[in-house]
Every structure is written in C-alpha cells, then in structure tokens.
Amino acid sequence: MYPAHLLVLLAVCVSLLGASAISNQPRNLVQFSELIQCVNKGKRATYHYMDYGCYCGKGGSGTPVDALDRCCKTHDDCYGQAEKKGCFPFLTLYNFGCFPGGPTCGKGNTCQRFVCDCDLKAALCFAKSPYNNNNYNIDTKKRCK
C-alpha cells in the first residue's frame, strides 16, 4: 500500500472516531444553555438548572416548588405550544445575539422565532428567580404531587 493511501485511511478512521464521540443530545439545548449564560453572565452554571424542582430537567409533573421551577414549567408549556404549531422545539436551531443589554432572538422562520422566544423568556425568568439549593436534585416522587 502506498503511504498516501495509508494517510487517507488514517484520516478516515480519525474522522469516524470523532463523529462517534458527538453527543446525540438535541442541539437546541446547547443554544438554550448559551442563552441562559448570556442572561446570567455566567453567575450560575447551566447544569444547576438540569435537575431542579419538579420541572427543570427531563419531564415534569405536580406543583412547581418555587418561582424558578415555575419558570421551567412555563418553558415546558411553551415547548408544548410550539409542538402544537407543528414545530420540533428540541431540534429547532435558531439565531440569537448576546449583547451587553441582553440577548435578542434573530430572524428566522415561525418555529425558530417561537422556540427562541420560549428559551429567551425562560432564561430571563431564571435570572430573576431565587435559586434554592434545597430544591436541587429533589425526590420528585415525594415532592412533585
């Protein structure tokens, strides 16, 4: 085998290894995380919102435990409205800008604007709501009824 062929084969193998390491997490969640960081200026890591209360994170049920959890329920409801409009909020990528005065949603189609608005409203709500460490990683079976 020629050295050039070996280099091409090596490049293909490295590319495939890199592609297999890419998460299948919906890319919209990355944008939502960036919006949160833009609004709170990095004061709280996004992962703190991933397992908070009854609604922040995957799923949601019961009565929200506090104002921050209500932000998450409102965000879930907003995504539900997006789905009713035929959008796929977890997969919809949108344009936004992070400016000194705060983030703004950019131009796009109806679904992109709607989903960006859901995420922006939630990020702003997170920023103004107190964070209670006692509501992080709670026992949802007991507290979310």
From Swiss-Prot:
One family name in Pfam for this protein: Phospholip_A2_1
Keywords: Calcium, Disulfide bond, Hydrolase, Lipid degradation, Lipid metabolism, Metal-binding, Neurotoxin, Presynaptic neurotoxin, Secreted, Signal, Toxin
GO molecular function: calcium ion binding; calcium-dependent phospholipase A2 activity; phospholipid binding; toxin activity
Required cofactor names: Ca(2+)
Secretion signal, residue range per the UniProt entry: 1-21
Native species: Laticauda colubrina (Yellow-lipped sea krait)
Propeptide: 22-27
Disulfide bonds: C38-C98, C54-C144, C56-C72, C71-C125, C78-C118, C87-C111, C105-C116
Family per similarity comment: Belongs to the phospholipase A2 family. Group I subfamily. D49 sub-subfamily.
Catalytic activity: a 1,2-diacyl-sn-glycero-3-phosphocholine + H2O = a 1-acyl-sn-glycero-3-phosphocholine + a fatty acid + H(+)
Function recorded in the entry: Snake venom phospholipase A2 (PLA2) that inhibits neuromuscular transmission by blocking acetylcholine release from the nerve termini. PLA2 catalyzes the calcium-dependent hydrolysis of the 2-acyl groups in 3-sn-phosphoglycerides.
Annotated binding of Ca(2+), by residue: Y55, G57, G59, D76
Tissue and organ distribution: Expressed by the venom gland.
PANTHER family: PHOSPHOLIPASE A2 A2-ACTITOXIN-UCS2A-LIKE, PHOSPHOLIPASE A2 FAMILY MEMBER
Main enzyme class: hydrolase
GO BP terms in the entry: arachidonate secretion; lipid catabolic process; phospholipid metabolic process
Cell location: Secreted
UniProt remark on cofactor binding: Binds 1 Ca(2+) ion.
Active site: H75, D119
Full protein name: Basic phospholipase A2 PC17
